[in-house]
Regions:
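Alpha-helical, largely C-terminal catalytic domains
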Residues: 1-130
Length: 130
């Protein structure tokens, strides 16, 4: 179960689901933040909107962390979810397309510590060179 969750948050190929993702996330945010006291709910909702907009340095950093965490967790489980789901390097790189833009240092660290070792041991499928 946990490894399936790691797969879903790290590089799910569900293209159909992505089409409705923003709407589903908005509905979930409205529901969840609506459960909180009004002032607290508004503050957290505004932070979520800031995160989604990716305009501030803080939002960009939060996005980098959001993208790196699944790689760290997959690496910590010896690539279990990547192996179970036959994850390709291209899926991971697509999920992290803005990570390098926002922090080349952290993306390079992720390549060295999480991606390359799992490519080397076959836990991530290397895409064919075209």
């Amino acid at each position: 179960m946990f490894s399936s969750f790691l797969f879903l948050i790290s590089c799910s190929p569900d293209e159909e689901g992505k089409k409705t993702q923003a709407d589903r996330e908005k509905k979930a945010a409205d529901r969840i933040y609506g459960l909180l006291p009004e002032e607290q709910g508004k503050m957290l909702y505004d932070l979520w909107l800031e995160f989604e907009a990716q305009k501030t340095p803080e939002a960009k950093f939060a996005r980098v962390m959001d993208n790196l965490q699944p790689m760290m967790l997959n690496a910590a489980t010896d690539g279990k979810a990547w192996v179970e789901h036959g994850v390709h390097l291209a899926q991971i790189m697509k999920r992290n397309e803005h990570t390098a833009e926002y922090s080349e240092t952290l993306m390079e660290y992720a390549r060295e510590m999480f991606i390359q070792p799992n490519l080397d041991n076959g836990h991530i499928i290397e895409d064919e060179k075209k």
